[in-house]
Amino acid sequence: MQAVQVKVLNPKITEDKAFSLPTRATDGSAGIDLRACIDEPLTIKAGTTHLIGTGLAIYIQDPNFAGMILPRSGLGHKHGIVLGNLVGLIDADYQGELMVSIWNRSLEDFVLNPAERMAQYVVVPVARPEFEVVTEFSDTSARGAGGFGHSGRQ
């Protein structure tokens, strides 16, 4: 995979020590943390969503990969802060600012601070099959057309 390009859209990312360019927290980290690029603390009321900029654009280029914005497990478990769209899928050819939909699913207000880590970004491989329109499938699977709850609890 070729290098993924990162464009800094907000100068405070390179000028303010509270902010930083995205890096992996450890050698084993799958992704990078995305920080809230906001000027002042933002109160996210219980049950509401806010669209928060990261101040970054990430251009993958290679169509065999995509970016995924995922919630941070600690924020979700401890504070009920997850993504409004649950998972953000970022196409390889997208060049705009990465925005994060933050949803406070808890019963209490949450204060998001400037430069706070709010989500994570992971690059994943993408299968790009050709699609063939058919009138019947070439064979029958054990599941067939069984839908919701078909293979588990009824």
Swiss-Prot record:
GO biological process: dUMP biosynthetic process; dUTP catabolic process
Pathway the protein takes part in: Pyrimidine metabolism; dUMP biosynthesis; dUMP from dCTP (dUTP route): step 2/2
Keyword Translocase: no
GO molecular-function terms, A-Z: dUTP diphosphatase activity; magnesium ion binding
Binding site for substrate: R72, S73, G74, N85, L89, I90, D91, M99
Domain of life: Bacteria
Family to which the UniProt record says this protein belongs: Belongs to the dUTPase family.
Descriptive protein name: Deoxyuridine 5'-triphosphate nucleotidohydrolase
Native source organism of the sequence: Psychrobacter arcticus (strain DSM 17307 / VKM B-2377 / 273-4)
Lineage, broadest ranks: Bacteria, Pseudomonadati, Pseudomonadota, Gammaproteobacteria, Moraxellales
